[in-house]
């Protein structure tokens, strides 16, 4: 199931695909301090829920890098995009996040 849920280049969106039905796909991501999740692109609108962590860095394919302070309980909604990125835990705590991708939604809907 995870292979079908990967981005078109074969890279998974999270560490583990934990649920999928016709409406949503739910990922868990866990990164120890210093660990990096591979390059991927989100092709669906999605929402993230921070479970644990403090600071992550998102290197983008265009060369830019975003530093993001995260707090447990924070919820962020993102539109699908075409910018490939990775995610690196540059904090002191394990980063744990839940990603909920919404199937069949158009960006901005």
Residue ranges and their predicted role:
Residues 1-13, 105-109:
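Basic/polar N-terminal segments that are highly enriched at the extreme N-terminus
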Residues 10-39, 45-48, 99-100:
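A short glycine-rich, His/Asp/Glu-containing loop-to-beta-strand
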Residues 37-39, 57-58, 84-91:
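Short beta-strand His + acidic residue motifs that chelate non-heme Fe in jelly-roll/DSBH
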Residues 43-62:
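Glycine- and acidic-residue-biased ligand/ion/polar-headgroup-sensing regions
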Residues 62-81:
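Short acidic-glycine-tyrosine-enriched beta hairpin
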Residues 80-105:
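Ligand-binding loop in jelly-roll beta-barrel domains
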């Amino acid at each position: 199931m995870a292979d079908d849920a990967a981005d078109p280049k074969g890279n998974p969106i999270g560490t583990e695909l934990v649920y999928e039905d016709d409406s949503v796909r739910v990922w868990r991501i866990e990164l120890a301090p210093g660990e990096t999740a591979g390059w991927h692109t989100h092709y669906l609108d999605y929402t993230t829920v921070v479970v644990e962590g403090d600071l992550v860095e998102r290197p983008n394919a265009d060369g830019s890098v975003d530093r993001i302070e995260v707090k447990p309980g924070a919820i962020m909604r993102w539109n699908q995009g075409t910018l490939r990125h990775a995610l690196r835990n540059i904090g002191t705590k394990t980063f744990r996040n839940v990603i909920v991708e919404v199937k069949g939604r158009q960006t901005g809907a």
